[in-house]
Amino acid sequence: MKLIFLLLLFGVSPIVCQDFEDGVFLAKITSIDEHDARKIGRRFGFEAQWKLQSYTDVYVGRRLRRRKRGIEDEIVAEMMLSQQVQFIEKLQGFRRYKRAPMTNKGYPVHVWNLTPSLYIREAWEDGFNASRVTVAVVDDGVDIKHVDLKSAFSPRVSFDFVRFGDLPTPKNSKEFEHGTQCAGLVAMEGQQCGLGVGHGATLGAIKLLGQDFLNDALEGDALAFQKDLIDIYSVSWGPKDDGKSAEKPAKFTEEAIKNGALHGRNGKGNIFVWASGNGGVNGDNCAYDGYVSNEYTLSFGVIDASGAPAAYGEGCSSVLAAVSGGDAMIQTTGLESTCSSISGSSASAAIASGIISLVLDANPTLSQRDIQHLIARTSNASAIRDVELYENSAGLNFHPKVGFGLLNAQKLVVMAATWENVAPQVTCEKMNLANGIIDNSDCDVTKVERVIVSGSIIHPHRGQVQIRLESPRGTISELLPLRPKDTSRDLLDWNFVSVNFFGENSRGIWKLHVTSEEDDVDFRVEMKMFKVVGTMS
């Protein structure tokens, strides 16, 4: 058994993480039971107070008494001398931001009436309503007594990670209505505000936002919560969309997402649905968002009624598809059993989650990878306007802001109903990409799903760097676009993820093209790993 302590130092409360100035630590202690774990904690001046929810061997603890701040380093060093302590590391506090609704005006429309059509009503008419599916909205809480949500709500797949309680209700303020709005788009039952896309789904509410700071342990704990009972995690938040920030999941959270995608749902894989971001007006792009640009998440853009990508929407090479409604106020649930309206990429993640819930209702045996294959095959590229689409060698059209096109719920459920699970995933990795030329001729992946390039950019103004990846078949994917507002130094240990090569044969020579907009600047790009995942035909 492996036990992990989360040690909150000098905190006013062990639950609400308001101030990280004095440090938060994560320690892993092996081969002991819970009683011994608590004894070890007290020996080092800490007391384990409760278990984290998603790990049977993880504990939250706090100091027994005050010590001088300089003693922290001594405590860490002392604990590392113990044979039972595998590691101890300091956690950083950080903020996460809701993909807040845009200030669009107009009469609210229902989700099934969006233009261009997502063919949601047609999927319902085919008999699918997500009654066999569980969707958890990870946000600032949900009004679980709302007349349109209370029947769908399940406490078994819900938790409040802000106050560590079973009822994830939000504060009664418009500022904390976001989760309730997203939940309505997924699961509202038509009593007052309309029907959610997956109006028969079981609704989980995981309250994570609403405190001043998060940390890696809380975030990872929330995203691993009830991973064998929850099918879809709907996430409409992320790092700040200011065109300057670059953040990614920390170690514990990244492991939670990876483990869920590979092993959740009893081996079929959880589906983590992420909003691509609202930073388009700031020149932002989701390649700098490590939750969206992630091997194990599914991210979605948004288009307006004309079919053009929404001006506020962010694009990147990991965006899988898009939903409509970018210029609409979409009616949904509000606090205190009211109706409200929402737009922005927050809505896109919730709508996409609802559509995927219909797909799983059509075929509960689908894996997380099956969902990606179905979306790539059925998305409607012809609905997209005002941008140039690119075609890969497998015949799929794509664009960074819309992926493979507009989701089509009816085509998805029809294809899903008779879909046979894809073959086991094959992975090829190449290390030390010194010259940007990757010989992948010996790889068995003949149908690509994703390509991941990992490394660092050393540059005085990282926003001036552009990275493109060319496949052996000539398809070019922009892994890192220019970002004019970003004048920060360096981008370290980053994963650049692309779905643009979906269906291509990976064998042959791949080429990385790196340029800087600034002349006479010394910079380097250190790419350490090239990874392609897919199937062998």
UniProtKB/Swiss-Prot annotation:
Any GO BP: neuropeptide processing
Main location class: secreted
PANTHER family listed in its UniProt record: ENDOPROTEASE AEX-5 (PTHR42884:SF33), PROPROTEIN CONVERTASE SUBTILISIN/KEXIN-RELATED (PTHR42884)
P/Homo B domain: residues covered: 407-537
Organism: Caenorhabditis elegans
Function in brief: Probable serine endoprotease which cleaves preproteins at paired basic amino acids. May process FMRFamide-like (flp) and neuropeptide-like protein (nlp) neuropeptides. In muscles, involved in neuronal retrograde signaling by regulating presynaptic activity and localization of synaptic vesicle fusion protein unc-13 at the neuromuscular junction (NMJ). Acts in the intestine to regulate anterior body muscle contractions (aBOC) and the expulsion steps during the defecation motor program (DMP).
EC number, as in UniProt: 3.4.21.-
Record bears the keyword ATP-binding: no
Entry GO MF terms: serine-type endopeptidase activity
Disulphide bridges: 286-316
Family: Belongs to the peptidase S8 family. Furin subfamily.
Domain Peptidase S8: 111-413
Sites where a glycan is attached: 129, 380
Annotated compartments: Secreted
Cross-referenced InterPro entries: Galactose-bd-like_sf (IPR008979), Kexin/furin (IPR034182), P_dom (IPR002884), Peptidase_S8/S53_dom (IPR000209), Peptidase_S8/S53_dom_sf (IPR036852), Peptidase_S8_Asp-AS (IPR023827), Peptidase_S8_His-AS (IPR022398), Peptidase_S8_subtilisin-rel (IPR015500)
Residues annotated as catalytic: 139, 178, 346
Signal peptide: 1-17
SUPFAM superfamilies for this protein: Galactose-binding domain-like (SSF49785), Subtilisin-like (SSF52743)
Stated consequence of mutating residue 184 to E: In sv76; intestinal lipid droplets are smaller and their number is reduced. Reduced uptake and accumulation of triglycerides in the intestine
Gene Ontology CC terms: extracellular space; Golgi membrane; trans-Golgi network
Propeptide residues according to the Swiss-Prot or TrEMBL record: 18-99
Protein name: Endoprotease aex-5
Phenotype seen when the gene is deleted: RNAi-mediated knockdown causes a reduction in fatty acid uptake. RNAi-mediated knockdown in the intestine causes a severe defect in the expulsion step of the defecation cycle.
